[in-house]
Amino acid sequence: MTNVTVTDNCKIAKFPAPEGDYRQIVLDYMKKMSQIKWTPKETFTITKKGPRSNVNLTYEKGKTYYGVTYSGTKCTLDQFEQLVHDGVFHNNGEYFDEVVGNHCSSSISTALQQLISNGGIGGTKPQKWYPGIFKFTNDIKIPYEYFGDDYSSFDIWDFNSKLKIFEGYSLLKSADILYYCKPGAGHVRMVYGDAEVVYDENGMIDGEKSTVSVIEQTNAWDKTVEVNTTWFVGRKYTFEKLYEKHFMPITLEFYSNGDVPKDAYVILDEKNSPSSIKGGLSGKITSTFPLNYAYATVKNSDGSIVRSSLKNNFTNVYELKLADMNSDLDLSSLAKGSYTYTLRVAIARGGADLESFDFVI
């Protein structure tokens, strides 16, 4: 549970470290993101056209959907919930890089950030520039001497046998990673349950019968279930199919290295007030974990939002000046009346209302 402490000069939100089985904590968060139920206020289509991927997903008014929308803004469950009111999603745009939502890697990154501050920024694979985060199962060889951190799945295949990769798949457990990458493209899945390994009569791994179940955020509707969702939950892939598509078996070092999660803190260094807000917001937010979003709203006496500013789609951002919201809020142009101002700030673990008060123009 998040606690907000108020001092003379600042406000501090504490996000306690989660307790329990680390793998289950991560997997449960992915499940929650895949299961949120909503219906769109109006029909909208998320689009993106480019060499890396094409997105064309229409969400229809009157239909029920499950899971955070597929988009490129790296949102957490908490951020998505801010736009869902009484089960209705009020979308904020129709472009892939505008609509609040997440995609394959950002969903996994926010899930891993339940435990650690770096959850895959820059790629969900072992890299020298941020060591100690990910590692391959089964001591799979990394050809750093030839490619540095820019190695692809194809390079890993060139330097490791098929048996080595299969043995790596066999070691996968819940909340591990399956990652395919090549220059300019890739896809990542989270392991949903421990690998199911079948051996043939010679004691070798049977790649056609051995499977790994996953949970993944995708750019397509799941046609195998009766609900509307882009989240594939519990889908099984054979070792052969994973190998054919060059998915690398990866685990988080945190699961086994003896480290423990740390409490996270978000600090607002200057308090706004009913008298000062008329001149605009001031102060700076700093965080010990990556910020996911900051959302300022102004509601009228009827409870309707008349001004808002959403700062999001962050990559490794740890501080934000509230003055950056003033152009969106345009508080000096508010008509005379009574209003309520709220500032919500969040990391992957969740959000907290750092400020909320009534004021009069």
Question: What are the language-model segments listed below?
Answer:
Residues 313-330:
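Aromatic sugar-binding surface patches on proteins
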Residues 328-338:
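Surface-exposed, short loops/turns at beta-strand junctions within beta-sandwich domains
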Residues 340-346:
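Extracellular recognition modules
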